[in-house]
């Protein structure tokens, strides 16, 4: 955000529109439908200081205009496109269409509508709502510079063994025992930033970023679970998080930065006794699932050459 000196004070400003909801349907000649549902947020950086200092709104892009632009641009998209490409399209429009706008940030969350399978066949126009959400943020400057981030919200994963936690700091406040056998469950929030720094060197392949989103999600899940027949041991959420981020950077050379947040969602062993003896004796079988309170673990990993 640009900083100015106004009447002896440092002043920063921006304005935008949040929670603009839009759905778009595309129909192929063969009768197959495709649908997306997006929640769009827009932030503009512009020279409209006079609107704050005096009765002069002549330099403001109205937030209602921003909202209408979302629908107009969605209408113009005659071909299916990724949420990243739509975010870039919107941000590019604002910095090129308005002389006073120097930069734009567009955030979008995509609702996970997935094609339904009926009698073993993909339905032509039927969809069910999935779980994790696809997110993106495009930051575009009038110069054409770009910062593009994608992400996942709500990727819930769990494994019933091959997890432990041992040899941590102990003191008079510590009650947690060491273990090499526990359930590991988390809800992954992931962000990754692409290395593309200009509007003019983006991949031209249709739906490139949609495919990349699915591939990153697979790498994260595969690293968490390990091979299907034996899994992989996790000595801590921290170690598993690092391996997931590292696998992402190793697999995708055009990703420069990864941030993962992985709360430790606890499954507590159930032991219940009465004065007459055990009612439930825990044998790695009965648990109390709880997410309040929960551990909070997050970290970022980037390439050494990255500017991030």
Swiss-Prot record:
It is found in: Peroxisome. Induction: In root nodules after infection by Rhizobium. Nodule uricase II levels increase from 11 to around 25 days after inoculation, then fall slightly. GO terms for molecular function: urate oxidase activity. Urate binds at residues 63-64, 165, 182, 237-238, 264. Pathway: Purine metabolism; urate degradation; (S)-allantoin from urate: step 1/3. The keyword Oxidoreductase applies. Keywords: Nodulation, Oxidoreductase, Peroxisome, Purine metabolism. InterPro entries: Uricase, Uricase_CS. It catalyses: urate + O2 + H2O = 5-hydroxyisourate + H2O2. It comes from the Eukaryota. The active site is at residues 17, 63, 266. One of its GO terms (biological process) is urate catabolic process. Catalyzes the oxidation of uric acid to 5-hydroxyisourate, which is further processed to form (S)-allantoin. Belongs to the uricase family. This is Uricase-2. The lineage of its organism: Eukaryota, Viridiplantae, Streptophyta, Embryophyta, Tracheophyta.
């Amino acid at each position: 955000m640009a900083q100015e000196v106004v009447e002896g004070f440092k002043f920063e400003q921006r304005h935008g529109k949040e929670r603009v909801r839009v759905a778009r349907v595309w129909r192929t000649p063969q009768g197959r439908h495709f649908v997306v549902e997006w929640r769009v947020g827009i932030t503009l950086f512009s020279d409209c200081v006079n609107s704050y200092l005096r009765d002069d709104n002549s330099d403001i892009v109205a937030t209602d205009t921003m909202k209408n632009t979302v629908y107009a641009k969605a209408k113009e998209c005659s071909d299916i496109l990724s949420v990243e490409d739509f975010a870039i399209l919107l941000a590019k429009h604002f910095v090129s269409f308005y002389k006073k706008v120097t930069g734009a940030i567009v955030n979008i969350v995509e609702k996970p509508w997935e094609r339904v399978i009926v009698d073993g066949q993909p339905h032509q126009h039927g969809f069910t709502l999935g779980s994790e959400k696809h997110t993106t943020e495009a930051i575009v400057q009038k110069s054409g510079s770009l910062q593009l981030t994608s992400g996942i919200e709500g990727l819930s994963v769990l494994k019933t063994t091959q997890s432990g936690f041992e040899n941590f700091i102990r003191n008079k406040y510590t009650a947690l025992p060491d273990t090499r056998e526990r359930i590991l469950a988390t809800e992954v929030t992931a962000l990754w930033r692409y290395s593309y720094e200009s509007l003019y060197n983006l991949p031209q392949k249709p739906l490139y970023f949609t495919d990349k989103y699915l591939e990153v999600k697979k790498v994260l899940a595969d690293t968490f679970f390990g091979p299907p027949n034996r899994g992989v041991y996790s000595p801590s959420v921290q170690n598993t998080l690092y391996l997931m981020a590292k696998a992402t950077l190793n697999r995708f050379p055009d990703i420069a930065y990864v941030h993962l947040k992985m709360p430790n969602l606890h499954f507590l062993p159930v032991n219940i006794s009465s004065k007459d003896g055990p009612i439930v004796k825990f044998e790695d079988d009965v648990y109390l699932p709880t997410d309040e309170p929960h551990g909070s673990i997050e970290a970022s990993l980037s390439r050494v050459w990255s500017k991030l």
